[in-house]
């Protein structure tokens, strides 16, 4: 059993998959987005931004931050799942030993912003970040996330990282 890194855009199914794997197997879960929010709030000078849309500078800095965590994890017998919406494949790949880590990216490159919007609004709760967004702002954000999904899918293909397309739903996460 290897450690698992799950990256990808917001609302793609990363946390859902991580929670399922933790329930079924003996994994510890590290949601990097919690740390991203903490960096933004407590250490703004570091320049790590906790936005829904991945930022190149944040991706690079978070990957470097995680490199130490990954190094420590690599020396333990415990198994971990790290998930993040703030790290691009090209930034994290240099820190993950593929003999010790399975790497997955999840996104929705083959949908429209309207289709994804309807799915999100149908299933969201008042705890979801999307609940606080106006329809117009959410549609604009989804347009950007679809573009990022397409780029990450392309990068994953070039880097030999498994990419899971949840454009048609999240059923494939459980196969």
Where are these regions (language model features)?
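Hydrophobic anchor at the beta1->P-loop junction of P-loop NTPases
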Residues: 6
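ATP-binding Walker
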Residues: 12
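Walker A/P-loop
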Residues: 15
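Conserved substrate/cofactor phosphate-moiety recognition/catalytic segment
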Residues: 19, 23-65
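Conserved beta-strand scaffold positions in the cores of enzyme catalytic domains, especially
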Residues: 27-29, 103-105, 163-165
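Glycine-rich phosphate-binding loop used to anchor ATP phosphates in small-molecule kinases
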Residues: 56-100, 104-110
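A glycine- and Lys/Arg-enriched "phosphate-lid" helix/loop adjacent to the NTP-binding pocket
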Residues: 102-148
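NTP-dependent small-molecule kinase module
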Residues: 147-175
